[in-house]
Amino acid sequence: MDNVTIDRLSPGVHTIDVNGTAQRYHVHGTGPVCLAMPGGPGVDWEYLRMPAVERRLTVVYVEPIGTGGSGRLASHPNGYTRERYTRALIALLDHLALPKAYLLGHSHGGFVVQHCALRHPDRVAGVVLYESAPLTGPEHVAEAIANVQEFTRRNADNPELPEVVNAFQATATISNDEEFGTVLRGLLPSYFADYWGRAEEFAPLRASVRGSHISSLDEHLVPEIIDDRAALAALAAPALVIVGRYDVICGVRWARELDTLIPSSQLLVLENSGHFGHIEEPDVFADAVADFVAPQSK
């Protein structure tokens, strides 16, 4: 790497301008570079910190436009399409003077990374699709409902279960950042394989997680429905697909479909995780990601 790239990858927070919108990113760790796109859309990036990964990789955490200290579009909370996020990712790669890079996307961030890899194969060295799926829409929602029903059966006797169920019911009426954060914190136990069995460990995340309300509409108020199934056969970059056995949102069914559809793919099922394997099984997760991005860094 040249001196410009080294400076722009120095530890800490950085800000660039992407077509008039501030785009922040945060650099942590040491080793080969991997950009990390968080989920939501709208969840503040800090939940995705991966200290075990940072021991072997330089992780560039993207703070997506519309969230945290990054700028907001004039059309906020609308207009945050995968194409918009992809343009910001490519602008960041240009700023870092990286001809190619590995991209990790968690949940909705996985949707963005898939899109970026399909649109810009020359800029993507490989992708980590972490709790992603090949599609959204009615089929995805139906699968999530079935998974949530299974979660409620497993936890039927837990006195805190009604709070989680109420949070799921409130998702359809979110209209501002405060409501988004409240619902997110209410949902969080369902995103772990065994939240209540490890509540002391996970409670600080639940208390601190924040975000910004971002709709699923483009700037013309048209819903962005994703279906990458036909396109994924053309995804040229190697892929690592990671899923938690107990993920209720982007579960094993979708991970297996991604693994089948992408020509050069490998699948890791984290048997003791839900949606947050980097927190629930950090060492297994980190070894898989680092071995994929930089096997020589062992």
Explain the meaning of each model-derived region.
Residues 235, 241-243:
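Short beta-strand/loop motif that positions the catalytic acidic residue
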Residues 148, 158-230, 237:
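Alpha/beta-hydrolase
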Residues 15-78, 92:
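Conserved HGGG/HGGXW glycine-rich cap/lid loop of the alpha/beta-hydrolase fold
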Residues 127-170:
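Flexible "cap/lid" loop of the alpha/beta hydrolase fold
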Residues 61-104, 108, 287:
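Active-site loop/oxyanion-hole signature of alpha/beta-hydrolase fold enzymes
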Residues 246-250:
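Acidic catalytic loop of the alpha/beta-hydrolase fold
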Residues 265-298:
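Catalytic active-site module of serine/aspartate enzymes centered on a nucleophile-bearing elbow/loop
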Residues 99-143:
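Conserved hydrolase catalytic core segment
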